[in-house]
Amino acid sequence: LQEADRSRVWSGIKSLDPSSPVKYDDASFDLLHTTDRKLTLRDAMNLQRNRLEGTKYKPQDQMELDGKGIPKKGEFDAVYKYPISNPNVMEAHIFQLKDEVPASAGGGTMWLSMGSPRNAPYLPYYGNILNTYQAYQELGDHYNDRSWYWTISRINDLVAKYPDLFEDGAIRTEMERLESQWMVE
C-alpha cells in the first residue's frame, strides 16, 4: 500500500472497530471486517471526518501549523499521517438505504457534505425532490457569499488555519446538532 492509502485504510478500520487487531504496519488489510455492534449513520459521518483521533498519529496537514514546514512529496514522518478527512476532500456522500422508502422515491436518503465534511454538515437529499434551497444552487468557481458551498469552504479554511480559535469544538457540536435534528425529521 502507498503510505497515504495505508493511513486512511488503517484509521478507517480503527474508527469503525477500535478493538480490531490490525496494526498500522501490517503488510495488507482485509477488505471486509465485522464489528460487535451495528454501525450507525453517525459512525459513517465520523468515519469521513476522521483525522486520526484516538491514535498516536497527527494529520499530515498539521505539520506546518506545528512549525515543521510543509510535507515534501514522497517523504514520510513517523507521527504525521494522511487522514481520511484531508484538505483535498471537496465533498462527501453517504447513501442510507431504508426499507420503508420505495425505490421510486430513491430507496433512502443521500447525505451530502457540500465541502469538506470536517467542517460542513451533512445535508439530507431525497430521490424525489424537485427543488433545493437557493444557496445550494449557486454555481461558480470563486467565492460567492450566496453559495452554501463557498460559505462552508470558507469556514473550513478558517478552522484549518486557526485551530486554536476553534479548539472548543463548537463548530463540530453545532454540525452534529443540526444533523441529529435532520435525522429524525
Language-model regions: role of each:
Residues 1-185:
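C-terminus-biased signal that marks the final domain/tail of proteins
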